[in-house]
Amino acid sequence: MKKHNEKEISRRRTFAIISHPDAGKTTITEKLLLFGGAIQQAGEVRARKAARHATSDWMEMEKQRGISVTSSVMKFTYRDFEINLLDTPGHNDFSEDTYRTLTAVDSVLMVIDSVKGVESQTKKLLEVCRLRHTPIMTFINKLDREGREPLDLLDDIESTLNIQCAPMTWPVGMGKRFRGTYHLYSKELTFFDPEADKGTGQTITVKGLEDPLLDELLGSQVEELRNDVELLEGAAHPFEQEAYLAGLQTPVFFGSAINTFGIQQLLDTFVEHAPAPLPRETESRAVSPYEEPFTGFTFKIQANMDPAHRDRIAFFRICSGKFIRGMKVRHIRLGREVQIANATIFMAQDRTNVDEAYPGDIIGIHNHGTIKIGDTFTQGEELKYTGIPNFAPEHFRKVRLLDPMKSKALEKGLVQLAEEGTTQVFRPLMGSDWIVGAVGLLQFDVVMHRLEHEYKVKAAYEPVSYVTARWVTGEKKKLEEFEKKEAMHLYRDGEGNLAYLAASQWRLDNTMENWREIQFHATREHS
C-alpha cells in the first residue's frame, strides 16, 4: 500500500484531556494554547466566579456556571506539529459526551490534582481509555499548593488505575517550598518562579544528582531530591515507548498549570512520543490513515454554536485520505452522494473555513438535520466506523409545555438536542407526552435552559416513575406481539428506535424473563 500524505499525517497529534472536575483541566487547555500561539492571554477560570471566561467554555450556561458541559475542539501548531485538542466536559454528568469524544482521539492527557489524588471521574474515564488501549500521559497539577507526597501519588495512580507510572520530571518541594522540577532523563533543573514569564525561571543542566552545583542551587532541599530519586530508581518504571503506546504505562509530569509551570516540558515530550493518527476499526476491516480514499465519522453534533445563525455543526474525525474543500463523498447511512462545500476548523467558538485537512484533523460540517452521530462518510466504499454508542439513560423527566402554541418548536428543540447526544428523547406509543432521558441530572438543566434561550420554548419537568430503559429488537411477529402486550411501557426514541422504559430493575428483569425471544439492549450504536 502506497503511503499517501505521509509527512502531513506524521505531523498530526489528536488528543483529549480527561480529569475529575476542578483538577485544572480548562487551565491546562488554555496554557497549551498559549504555547501554541493560539491565544494571547489565558482566560483563567476561577471556580464559578469568572469575570473573564475560559476560551474553551463558550456556551452561555457554561459561562454562568464556570463549568464545561460541551466538548470543544481547538487546533494549534507547536514545533511544526499540528495539534488537535479536544476539550471534554469536566462535569460528572457529561460522561456520555466525553466517551464519544474519546472515540475520536489517538491519545489522552490525564490531569490529577496533587491535593486529592485519583478521583472517581478520572477512574471512569480511564476505564474507557483502557477499552481502546489509548496511550495516556499524566500531569500532576497544583504543586504550588500543599498536597500529597509525590511517591504517594504515583502509588495511588498505579494501584487505583492499574497502570504503570514512569515519572519524567520530579518536584523539588511543594506548596511554599516548591522550587521547581528535576528532569530525570535530561538532568535539567527548572526553577519555579511565579513572577517570571510563563511561571518558569532558569533551566540549568547539571551533571547528575551528585553535581555540587545542585547543593549551591537548592541548599537544604537537595538531600530530599537525592533521596527521592534514589527511591525512584529502585521502585519506579523507566519510560518505555512501546508500553506507553499500548496504554500500559503513563509518563508522569509535575507542575502548576495556573502558573504555566511544567506545561512546556509536558508538551515537548507529548509531540515527540504521542502517536500520530492510528488505524480505525469499521464493521468490515481496519482502515489505515495512509490509505488514499477519504473516510471519517461524526462523533458529535452541536446546535447553535453561533446564536446569530442558529446553526448546527457536525464534528467529523478524518480517518484516511485527504479532505479537499468542495469534494463529493458518500453518506453511508443515507446511501447518497453529498458535497462538503464549507467545512471549518475550530478554535473554541472561532471558526475558519478549511481548504484541505488530513487524517487526525477534526473538521466541522454544516448540518441541516441530515447528519447524525456515528455517521460514516467515504469516497465510495461501504464502510461503517464502529464504537460510538448511546447509553441507556438512568434518569427520566416528563416535559410539560407551558405554551400550547409552541408544540412544534418543542419537538424541534428536543429532537435537535437529542441528536447532539447529551440527552435522549422518547415518545410513547400510547399518548403524546415527551420523556427526556439522561445519564446525569445536570443534563436536564441544560435542556431546559437551551429550550428557553435557543428555541424560545418555556416548559417544565414533571417526575416519572421510570428508572431505566432498554432498546428492544426481535423477529417481526414476536415484536408486534410484544408491542401489543407492553404498549403502556413502549416508546420511540428520537431516531425512531423502539425502547422499553421500566419503573424498577425488578420490572425490567421480569419483562425480560417473560419475553425471552426479544433482545433488550443497554447500549445502541449510533445510526
UniProtKB/Swiss-Prot annotation:
GO biological process: regulation of translational termination
Record key words, sorted: Cytoplasm, GTP-binding, Nucleotide-binding, Protein biosynthesis
Any one Pfam family match given in the protein's UniProt record, by short name: RF3_C
Mitochondrion found in the keyword field: no
Binding site for GTP: 19-26, 87-91, 141-144
Subcellular locations according to the entry: Cytoplasm
GO molecular function annotations of the record: GTP binding; GTPase activity; translation release factor activity, codon nonspecific; translation release factor activity, codon specific
Disulfide pairings: none
Classification via Gene3D superfamilies: P-loop containing nucleotide triphosphate hydrolases, Peptide chain release factor 3, domain III
Entry keyword Protein biosynthesis: yes
Domain tr-type G positions: 10-278
Broad class of the protein's primary localization: cytoplasm
One term under GO cellular component: cytosol
Superkingdom per UniProt: Bacteria
Similarity remark: Belongs to the TRAFAC class translation factor GTPase superfamily. Classic translation factor GTPase family. PrfC subfamily.
NCBIfam families for the chain: prfC (TIGR00503), PRK00741.1 (NF001964), small_GTP (TIGR00231)
PANTHER family linked to this entry: PEPTIDE CHAIN RELEASE FACTOR RF3
Function: Increases the formation of ribosomal termination complexes and stimulates activities of RF-1 and RF-2. It binds guanine nucleotides and has strong preference for UGA stop codons. It may interact directly with the ribosome. The stimulation of RF-1 and RF-2 is significantly reduced by GTP and GDP, but not by GMP.
Protein name: Peptide chain release factor 3
Organism encoding this protein: Geotalea uraniireducens (strain Rf4)
Lineage: Bacteria, Pseudomonadati, Thermodesulfobacteriota, Desulfuromonadia, Geobacterales
